[in-house]
């Protein structure tokens, strides 16, 4: 089979670059699970919960009027208390914030997933706003300020997938 599984149609073009967009999108949807790439599912649920009472009408509205840093700090303080409570009772399988941190892109004072960074710069260059992606960056900074983390985690590529799909 040419290309990635799920991205090549049954009548199959031999060049992956010729796969039709609709078939590539369906391939992505059918081959993304909860283990890898699927963390975006949890991210969408997380963001829906965070924004449910904000009155946000459109994710690309740059004049949304929300104080993302304050929202992120409030969440980070609640998360810090939750994490401490869970650790105190011996639960190390407590809920993690989806789509932040990465086993490869870590260990620096401020961490970046280069794939997410590329997309974020691309969005900025094209004038595309996404309040959800901006909120994710507020979250990783607030978690550091609230001493939930020892450094600024990266926002990983699964977050990008989630915020784009959620914006749709």
PLM region descriptions:
Residues 1-168:
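Hydrophobic alpha-helical bundle cores within soluble ligand-binding/oligomerization subdomains
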């Amino acid at each position: 089979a040419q290309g990635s599984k799920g991205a090549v149609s049954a009548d199959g073009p031999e060049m992956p670059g010729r796969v039709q967009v609709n078939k590539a999108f369906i391939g992505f949807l059918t081959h993304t699970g909860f283990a890898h790439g699927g963390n975006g599912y949890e991210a969408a649920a997380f963001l829906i919960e965070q924004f449910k009472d904000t009155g946000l009408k459109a994710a690309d509205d740059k004049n949304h009027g929300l104080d993302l840093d304050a929202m992120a700090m409030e969440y980070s303080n609640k998360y810090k208390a939750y994490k401490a409570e869970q650790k105190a009772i011996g639960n190390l399988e407590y809920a993690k914030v989806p789509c932040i941190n990465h086993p490869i892109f870590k260990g620096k004072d401020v961490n970046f997933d280069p794939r997410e960074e590329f997309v974020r710069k691309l969005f900025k260059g094209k004038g595309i706003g996404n309040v959800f992606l901006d909120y994710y960056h507020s979250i990783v900074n607030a978690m550091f300020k609230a001493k939930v983390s020892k450094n600024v985690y990266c926002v990983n590529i699964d977050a990008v997938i989630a915020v784009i799909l959620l914006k749709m």
